[in-house]
A protein has these predicted regions:
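C-terminal amphipathic alpha-helical interaction region
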Residues: 180-229
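P-loop NTPase catalytic core
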Residues: 1-10, 14-24, 30, 36-37, ...
Length: 229
């Protein structure tokens, strides 16, 4: 714009024009910062400092799964150091059990692609148990209700016991399948609902509820062993 044209504007219009030009320059700089050719370098520099990445997932938020953090894309570079602390101060097999849960979630993601193409019935009994165990991890362990007076806080002890219950269901169900037990009976066990409610257990009742739930799991699987669908 020439100075002659600019001079014809009123003072108010000049101020508005200058303000808009300033905004455009600012937005251009912001766009270049977040989407420019050096954005990858800035991301990597940030990750080297914080060493943690939380992958927020809109699909989880749409399903009302909170916190809506994708467990497959998120990671922490502190895992090795923190793992030693968890094993020493919470339970000696904390990291081992954590790896079992992560493996189930990763395998679930692979099986979901098969289910989308040919349906759940095409999966083997072992894979169906794997899918159900992964669903329990997502809905019973990872999902948290911040508006619930008990579930809004979860101690490391409770998290550990929840892991043991989910893993117990998975491993004992696989053993039962090897002995000829039908898949439908295992999936319909009443104890599964009790495992899902464990996160609402008060801290002073954790040990007793864990023991009772474990006993129910053992008893119900024992009653099903060898029974076909």
């Amino acid at each position: 714009m020439s100075n002659a044209v600019f001079a014809t504007f009123s003072l108010e219009n000049r101020i508005i024009l200058l303000r808009n030009i300033t905004k455009l320059q600012f937005l251009k700089k912001c766009h270049h910062f977040f989407h420019g050719k050096d954005v990858y370098k800035r991301q990597q520099a940030t990750l080297r400092i914080v060493k943690v990445f939380w992958g927020l997932d809109s699909s989880l938020a749409y399903k009302r799964h909170f916190p809506a953090i994708n467990w497959l894309t998120s990671y922490s570079l502190y895992l090795d150091n923190l793992g030693k602390w968890f094993d020493a101060h919470v339970a000696g097999d904390w990291m081992k059990d954590r790896q079992k849960l992560m493996s189930l979630l990763q395998e679930e993601a692979e099986l979901e692609e098969i289910v989308k193409m040919v349906g759940m019935d095409a999966l083997s009994a072992h894979d169906r148990v794997k899918m159900e165990a992964a669903r329990s991890i997502r809905e019973d362990f990872l999902h948290q209700n911040s508006f619930h007076e008990i579930d809004t806080y979860s101690s490391l002890k409770k998290q550990y016991l929840m892991m043991k219950l989910v893993i117990g269901f998975y491993e004992k169900s696989l053993e039962a399948l090897e002995q000829g037990t039908g898949i439908q009976g295992l999936l319909k066990m009443p104890v599964r609902e009790r495992i899902g409610r464990f996160k609402y257990t008060p801290e002073d009742r954790l040990d007793q509820e864990y023991e009772d739930t474990g006993n129910d799991l053992n008893e119900q699987i024992a009653n099903l062993k060898g029974k076909e669908d």
